[in-house]
């Protein structure tokens, strides 16, 4: 077998005809500056070709259901294995996905509870046994005399199919009627069933009227129904309720039956297990009164109602005003009273209506007064009705902005029916086990108490559960609970879960390509991740890891350094070899940092706070009712192990609460008592790595406001004035100046059914996006398309004489984006590049000194040299008097902070407290702070810094 993966002539994105040879069955790290081309080589070339070759081996029918990748622009790749990509962009957004379902642990738990669980009565809690026919007959006979009943045998329950043969067989066996999806049909005259829909089919065994003499006939009918329904029978009261009886399990005291103990009974994604109220989601979306009346200090006349249509009440006109006047007259309250001082009964009437009580509404039309009487629906009731009735996604989004998720009152957020929650294994139901952290679940299953029979049944199931839990623990995720929703996981957590799942599959001879698996992982847990990667390699797999973490690079077998610069300045292999060879290579920037020849510089001093923000009583998720002080006017790093409570404190409480107060957002902060010191700020801005736009029409020029200035420059030329062109003529988003053949995209998509869609340059504008007349207008010899095709560095030189343009372009260069083209589609920017575009936009604004910036792991995707540039930007924002709160694990950022708040001591239920706070020098002295111990080593090497 080939010992190497050989890539020849790779030209994807900015790769410059690259040749590279990679050793198989090794752990290879690809590194380089953000935008240097490492992801283009790893994901868009090697993975894309491996995946494409596999998909091409399938039939054309199968291919249309799989996302087929474009053939990368390469001469050849040899030695490829089947490729599996584990990146961070595929985090599930499905609210039904949990850590348990993603890792398949929940599937094994369902099987365990179905086969070895002990059922209890959901009403009285006693252990229940199988029900006899005599017990069922006795219960039916307690119905009122003369009650008409049907005895039904359920033969199909909530399954897809046509069931033609089954129904024909029932007719041959002498049965006359069936109830299909709730309606009774003659078996001789059945409707055609849709095979793609789920159906419930019950055969009518007998029709009876309850009286003393039906005892024998009822027994015979129930026995027949039980035989046909495989232990289940339905007694349906005509014009009444259905009761399901089971020969399996029923409570002799309460008469409550539990259906068959099947795995689907424990699935919240199946109607037979899901809570009927929340459909298995565990939460209900309800209109939150706090979103309707966000400011209790305002009166109704001052616009206290922040609902579309009602916020115009202060204008003195319109329907809203008429209803508010009528309500104030009817119930005797003033529209000038702050809503926080109005009686609860009045607030209830405003929100939920007058029920059937009518109010007199007066109106004016054509100068004449009129009146009508009508009940008032209530604002919340009205919004809920409109939400149910609308088919518009846009309107649904508007109504959902007033809603918040509240735990389901029926299941208490546990997602399952009460019957499923009444089944236990070793005294715990499936929800209680799912709510355990991985750490506690490992302990529970290692010491589980089962009978000899149950242990025999559960042996193989427990083996699978224990191994999967062990893999989650080994990748540093022992603080997660199995019930944790997958959409709340960070990119790094989701990636490590998929990594643990892959180890569980024990595949051999596979090429794994990973995207920064160390993201979100504290240095303390790094060794666990590295052991996992080594284990995957030792199984006989090849690992290509796109990574910037120093420890991961030093632990690898082979490093490929891509560069030397980013964008057009990158795309070459600068160095390739073992970590020792890279460190000795003078051409490798990565080698310079690894060897210590170059370091991210420390500041000369630590700034002193200009004020404080105090978060009181923070108790969201695992936070332990803590009070935390954030300094203002400085750079603060919030650190701690994964799951220690950093995001809960900063994103869920600090950011959402201040955003609601300062930005008037509808964000609902997590549980806390309050925040003191907000008056010292005028705005809060979150700078994350989400895309700056979702379509190719968005680019750095449009996001930063450069495009508006550039269009103004072109509109001010003599040629444009002669032609009567305004600045909108130079926009590719509106009709007029753009090419209408491609609507200003420059490319046209051609749909290929069994092949990937093909994008070809527009043959009218030749990919230039504008029509001929617009492109004839030039500034300093360049047209608008040629300007958008410039890099920021080229544009800075070109527009250097125009101060406003030059200032914005200079900040783009300062944050390390000089190589990015002005018109580069936002969809082609990496997360790190998108974040720096946002930082450049903020830097170019006039500083107020009263802004709080929140950054969540800004070093994601950044090389050590990029981190150095990022640090310079962060320090500039702080020098302008602004405050920064940064969630970070990267020690090169933490060591340059003015203040550190270290959360912990561990993750999950062992976290949620402040372990240490102060300058990096002060935190380094705290012995039980993991972050402090790492800082201690750095400060010993690079020297402590004084306070200013």
Model-derived regions: residue spans:
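Conserved phosphate-binding elements of NTP-dependent enzyme cores
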Residues: 1-948
């Amino acid at each position: 077998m080939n010992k190497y993966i050989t890539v020849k002539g790779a030209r994807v994105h900015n790769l410059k005809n690259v040749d590279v040879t990679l050793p198989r069955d090794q752990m290879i790290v690809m590194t380089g500056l953000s935008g240097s081309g490492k992801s283009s080589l790893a994901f868009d070339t090697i993975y894309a070709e491996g995946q494409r070759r596999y998909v091409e081996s399938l039939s054309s029918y199968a291919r249309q259901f799989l996302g087929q990748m474009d053939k990368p622009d390469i001469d050849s790749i040899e030695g490829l294995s089947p490729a599996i990509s584990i990146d961070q962009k595929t985090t599930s957004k499905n609210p039904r996905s949990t850590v348990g379902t993603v890792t398949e642990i929940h599937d094994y738990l369902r099987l365990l509870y179905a086969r070895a669980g002990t059922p209890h009565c959901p009403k009285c809690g006693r252990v229940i046994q199988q029900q006899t026919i005599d017990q069922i007959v006795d219960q039916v006979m307690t119905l009122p005399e003369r009650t008409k009943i049907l005895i039904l045998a359920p033969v199909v329950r909530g399954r897809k199919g046509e069931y033609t043969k089954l129904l024909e067989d029932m007719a041959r066996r002498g049965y006359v009627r069936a109830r299909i999806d709730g309606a009774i049909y003659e078996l001789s005259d059945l409707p055609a069933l849709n095979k793609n829909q789920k159906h419930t089919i019950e055969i009518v065994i007998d029709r009876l009227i309850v009286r003393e003499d039906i005892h024998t006939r009822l027994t015979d009918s129930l026995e027949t129904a039980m035989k046909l329904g495989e232990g289940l029978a339905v007694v349906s009261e005509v014009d009444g309720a259905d009761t399901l009886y089971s020969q399996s399990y029923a409570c002799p005291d309460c008469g409550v039956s539990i259906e068959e103990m099947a795995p689907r009974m424990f699935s919240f994604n199946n109607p037979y297990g899901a809570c009927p109220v929340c459909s298995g989601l565990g939460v209900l979306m309800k209109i939150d009164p706090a979103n309707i009346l966000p400011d209790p200090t305002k009166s109704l006349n001052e616009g206290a109602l922040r609902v579309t249509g009602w916020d115009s009440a202060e204008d003195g006109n319109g329907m809203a005003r008429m209803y508010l006047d009528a309500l104030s007259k009817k119930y005797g309250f003033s529209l000038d009273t702050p809503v926080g001082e109005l009686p609860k009964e009045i607030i209830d009437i405003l929100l939920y209506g007058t029920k059937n009580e009518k109010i007199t509404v007066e109106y004016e039309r054509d100068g004449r007064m009129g009146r009508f009487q009508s009940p008032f629906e209530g604002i919340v009731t009205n919004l809920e009705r409109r939400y149910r009735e609308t088919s518009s996604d846009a309107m649904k989004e508007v109504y959902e902005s007033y809603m918040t998720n509240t735990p389901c009152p029926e299941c208490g957020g546990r997602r399952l029916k009460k019957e499923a929650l009444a089944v236990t294994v070793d005294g715990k139901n499936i929800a209680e086990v799912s709510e355990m952290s991985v750490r506690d679940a490992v302990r529970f299953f290692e010491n589980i108490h089962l009978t000899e029979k149950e242990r025999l049944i559960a042996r193989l199931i427990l083996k699978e559960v224990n191994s999967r839990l062990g893999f989650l623990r080994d990748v540093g995720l022992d603080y997660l609970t199995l019930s944790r929703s997958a959409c709340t996981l960070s990119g790094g957590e989701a990636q490590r879960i998929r990594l643990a799942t892959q180890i569980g599959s024990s595949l051999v001879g596979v090429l794994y390509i990973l995207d920064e698996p160390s993201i979100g992982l504290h240095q303390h847990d790094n060794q666990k991740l590295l052991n996992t990667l080594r284990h995957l390699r030792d199984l006989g797999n090849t690992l290509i890891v796109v990574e910037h973490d120093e420890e991961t690079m030093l632990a690898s077998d082979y490093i490929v350094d891509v560069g030397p610069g980013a964008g057009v300045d990158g795309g070459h292999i600068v160095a390739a070899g073992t970590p020792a060879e890279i460190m000795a290579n003078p051409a490798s920037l990565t080698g310079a940092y690894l060897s210590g020849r170059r370091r991210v510089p420390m500041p000369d001093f630590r700034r002193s706070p200009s004020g404080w923000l105090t978060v009181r009583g923070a108790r969201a998720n695992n936070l332990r009712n803590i009070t935390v002080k954030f300094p203002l006017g400085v750079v603060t790093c919030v650190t701690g192990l994964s799951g220690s409570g950093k995001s809960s404190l900063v994103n869920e409480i600090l950011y959402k609460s201040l955003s609601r107060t300062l930005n008037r957002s509808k964000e609902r902060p997590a549980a806390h008592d309050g925040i003191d010191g907000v008056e010292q700020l005028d705005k809060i801005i979150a700078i994350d790595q989400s895309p700056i736009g979702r379509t190719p029409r968005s680019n750095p020029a449009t996001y930063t406001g450069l495009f508006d200035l550039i269009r103004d420059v072109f509109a001010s030329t003599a040629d444009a004035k002669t032609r009567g062109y305004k600045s909108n003529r130079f926009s590719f988003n509106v009709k007029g100046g753009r090419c209408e053949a491609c609507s200003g995209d420059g490319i046209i998509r051609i749909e290929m059914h069994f092949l990937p869609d093909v994008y070809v340059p527009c043959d009218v504008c030749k990919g230039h996006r504008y029509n001929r007349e617009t492109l004839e207008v030039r500034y300093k010899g360049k047209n608008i398309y040629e300007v958008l095709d410039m890099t920021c560095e080229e544009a800075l030189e070109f527009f250097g004489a125009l101060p406003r343009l030059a200032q914005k372009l200079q900040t783009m260069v300062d944050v390390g984006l000089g190589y990015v083209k002005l018109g580069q589609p936002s969809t082609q920017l990496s997360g790190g590049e998108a974040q720096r575009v946002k930082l450049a936009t903020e830097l170019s604004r006039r500083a107020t000194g009263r802004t709080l910036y929140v950054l969540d792991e800004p070093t994601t995707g950044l090389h050590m040299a990029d981190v150095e540039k990022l640090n310079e930007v962060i320090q500039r924002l702080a020098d302008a008097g602004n405050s920064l709160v940064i969630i970070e694990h990267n020690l090169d950022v933490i060591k340059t902070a003015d203040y550190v708040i270290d959360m912990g001591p561990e993750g999950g239920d062992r976290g949620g407290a402040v372990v240490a706070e102060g300058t990096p020098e002060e935190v380094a002295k705290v012995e039980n702070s993991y972050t402090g111990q790492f800082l201690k080593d750095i400060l010993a090497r690079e020297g402590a810094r004084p306070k200013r």
